[in-house]
């Protein structure tokens, strides 16, 4: 993941050369809303959508499926970096068959508020965590099954550390930010000097600045860099719906993106690695770690968590044929595995 983030980081930031140009992205909140509507149009299940207002004038964009099944512990979905609720389009219908499912855009991403985040990694992380807790209070949820992908997995773990009584089961899907950067990382995987130099030059800029600088060419850039997303959602769309959604999610004001940058060190590693803190987590919180068998992510975090929590429930599941975006690569298998986990709760 570190390598993938850094490559994207460097490629996109070439746009800094043209940073004197005015913003010229053909986007708006209305464009993002319309792109999200297209992502969700194939979902037959009924659902509620609303802004949930939290302190400091912020609001969290929220989707709720099967609200009438409130007798079971609800499943709450946290998306990854650069994502939004629309990327769960392949999962909602299956997951909400037997229980309520909530999905929301993380603070600073998607259609949620995009406030200023602290430049300190600890404080930025806490802002994310507190926004999740404030959302939970406003939604009136006593306990939840918390599932997070990528950055969402990191934040789900951080939330569980601070508010353990609210989490019935923690599901980490290809989580970012768990291992610390090894001292010999550069020796095992040598990084060319020119890349280090480029990274130093570009360090003041946000990871996706180049996408915004690209303006009307940004959508083509998304399509060129990530053609795999069209294939992942081909059962639902045969056009550029997914690329349009990702584009409009990420050319708005870079709020959560800036927070993420401030939580990382070269080259994509977390400043405050989660594995260092996992032993402090309440021993009664069950954890399931889900990885794609074909993922470029190091899957050792699951076994490391097991060794760090010898007296707690920890299970690792590998989804065959799936990469980092497990929920989209093999949605049927992923959905069934998550439903099985939820059924073990109640």
Residue ranges and their predicted role:
Residues 1-47, 122-130, 137-138, 142, ...:
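Flexible "cap/lid" subdomain of the alpha/beta-hydrolase fold that forms the substrate-access gate
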Residues 49, 101-103, 316-318:
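Conserved beta-strand scaffold positions in the cores of enzyme catalytic domains, especially
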Residues 52, 62, 76-79, 88, ...:
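Generic structural signal for small/hydrophobic residues in well-ordered secondary structure
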Residues 58-117, 139, 149-155, 162:
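Conserved HGGG/HGGXW glycine-rich cap/lid loop of the alpha/beta-hydrolase fold
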Residues 82, 106-110, 177, 295-296, ...:
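Alpha/beta-hydrolase active-site loop signature
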Residues 83, 123, 127, 329:
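Residue-level signal for the nucleotide or nucleotide-sugar donor/cofactor binding architecture
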Residues 91, 159, 337-341:
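Hydrophobic residues on the short alpha-helix immediately C-terminal to a glycine-rich phosphate/catalytic loop
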Residues 285, 311-346:
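Catalytic active-site module of serine/aspartate enzymes centered on a nucleophile-bearing elbow/loop
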